[in-house]
Amino acid sequence: LRRQRQMCIRDRTGVAEAYLDSSPMFVISGQANSKILQYQMDTGIRQKGTQSLDLEPMVSSITKYFAAVMSPDSIRFHMEKAYYSAMEGRRGPVWLDVPIDVQNRQAPEQMKGFDIPEDKKTDAEISSEALERLAKSEKPLVLAGFGVRASGSAGKLLEFCDKQNIPVVTSRGGIDVITTDNPLFVGRPGSYGDRASHFAIQECDFMLILGSRLSVSTIGYYPDRFGKNAYKVMADIDRKEIDKRDVPVDENY
């Protein structure tokens, strides 16, 4: 998975991996006749056609958007909405299921498209307390995850760390945020981490956590001991990751 836009015709294991890795993927699957599919969806019957299967219950938990395209008139709307969903926010796979009769019908030249919602997000400003703590910090540390790379912010982060002389550790997902020969690179913590990064985390007095979900493989099974001496500030695009009860942070954005 290259964490870029991808096209796939099957199957679910790859989609699940893309979902967990925040990798955008566009899946198009074939399906039995739309009338047969609609009957299955309405009645919950296990199977009606020879190769028919209602896919939505199977893949809805590993996709950001799923739609059964029941009419060629709606294909543009679903294509545009699926693409937007795959690339907006925390990226991930989307899935369009197209019945055989819809595939064989002619689509009109003029079709309704998907209207992209107005972006209401605003740039969060770090609190004055956090800035003051960072300025007074004697042992600051940055923990960079895949979100730094996915947002295109790796260059800005390294520029900031270089200017402030702040060392960096990375999660496994952020492995390419900073090169290993960079003087500011310390290591990678976690289950398969190195000694230096673990010491840095436990000894730092201020930790800036960027684009990392602080997985169990990164912080271990005793989250209250993670960076126990540090004031921790976390920024992540996925609010669900920030709201985890066991994430040991003092501020989040």
Regions found by a protein language model. Give the residues of each.
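N-terminal alpha/beta PP-like core and its mobile active-site loop of ThDP/TPP-dependent enzymes
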Residues: 3-6, 10-253
